[in-house]
Amino acid sequence: MNHIISRRTFLRRASLWAGAAAMGPSIVPSSVLGLDGGVAPSNRIGLGFIGQGGRGQGIAPGFLGAGSQAIAVCDVWSNRADAAKQRLGAARAYTDFRELLARDDIDAVVIATPEHWHVPIAIAAAKAGKDIYCEKSLGTTVAEGRILCDTIKRYGRVFQFGTQQRSEQNFRRACELVRNGRIGKLHTIMITVPGGGTRQLLAPSPPPKELDFDMWLGPAPAIPYVGQALDDRWAGMPDYAVGFLSTWGVHHSDIAQWGHDTELSGPVEIEGKGDYLNVEFCNIANEWRAECTFADGVKLIHYSAGKAPAPLQGDSEGVLFEGSEGSVYVRRGNVLETTPVSLKTSEILPQEIHLYESNNHADNFLDCVRTRRQTISPVEVAQRSTTISLLCDIAMRLGRKVKWDPVTETFPGDDAANRLLSRTMRGPWQV
């Protein structure tokens, strides 16, 4: 961002000086110079928004304020791109993200596309010198996520993952209680998320003229256009996602590993059973129970809501930490419950563990773009949180227990499982 600011500042000041010399004294509004306490336009973070479907539309306004501005938007649906341009006050709308990334007035991008596009676009953005906010899941395979981690490090980019629960006080508080031993020795973590994600598609038909369908498919296999159901229901199709197991599950596996202090590691054994519906293009786990065992013996049990046991029944989502001396339950809606009840107000002392504090996920990203600090949800954590869901899916598809090495990110001596860590990507989008 600094090289853009310095160039713009020079040009702006040169223009002002030239105008003053030619016309004599003039009054420049303080807002233009940033002297009113606001941020001068030349010092604002220039943002590009890639993906303006439901999620993209929902999160975009949160990134815009006095310190940032929308420069350009992109969506493979031209009508969506045009509407987003008007809605966000951007200068240009594109249907090809490469054109957006080529702009030197964009400092950072917000990626909210279907998941099969996350890694290729994020890698291209990093190579183009942009900082990156990327929605979850990180990608569709462990291998592509690792390539992205390496790329972010190589190019020195700021990265924020869309696991916004880390910026909610009740989730941070729950993890601090667990990390500081308030429930004794942790032995079990149970998470539940909504099931579903498998859908029946419509009959093949010509794509609408507003849609660049080949670009929508991108690195995924070429298939016929099967109605807008494809655009609306991609999360239930394994070519584009891993269903709610990951699309939703990443949120709570992230909190589970944050509380367990394994956010940069992972389990060593995984097993489970999923109910897969054998529907063309849509063979995703509809309901599931998967169990991950860590090196310290702690078990993370991942449930769809329909399979959840008594402590979690009735809630469509939540995280339960169980220890030798108590438990902590946390979910959305600012819910935090503890056993014993007194734990809820237990003071975390200055010398104890205090986790990274963020009270607004978008603001944390923008602040880190300015300061070059690490975000609350950096890319390595994104990789490990996503990997939990991918490992559960692999074990369930194989129908057996698998052993995992979180250091090498491989299944030692298991060729069948290792083959599921990557997939063929359609050209020219290989990473």
Task: Please tell me what each predicted stretch does.
Residues 51, 182-200, 212-226, 268-277, ...:
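NAD(P)-dependent dehydrogenases' Rossmann-like dinucleotide-binding region
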Residues 214-297:
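Rossmann-like dinucleotide-binding domain that binds NAD(P)(H)
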Residues 280, 288-359:
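NAD(P)-dinucleotide binding in Rossmann-like oxidoreductases
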Residues 131, 139-215:
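A contiguous active-site-proximal alpha/beta segment in oxidoreductase catalytic domains
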Residues 168-191, 203-204, 246-275, 295, ...:
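Oxidoreductase and adenylate-handling cofactor-binding alpha/beta cores
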Residues 161-163, 239-246, 274-279, 305-308, ...:
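Active-site rim elements
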Residues 13-40, 367-431:
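C-terminal helix-rich "cap/oligomerization" subdomain common to oxidoreductases
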Residues 1-134, 143-158:
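N-terminal glycine-/serine-/threonine-rich beta1-alpha1-beta2 phosphate-ribose binding loop
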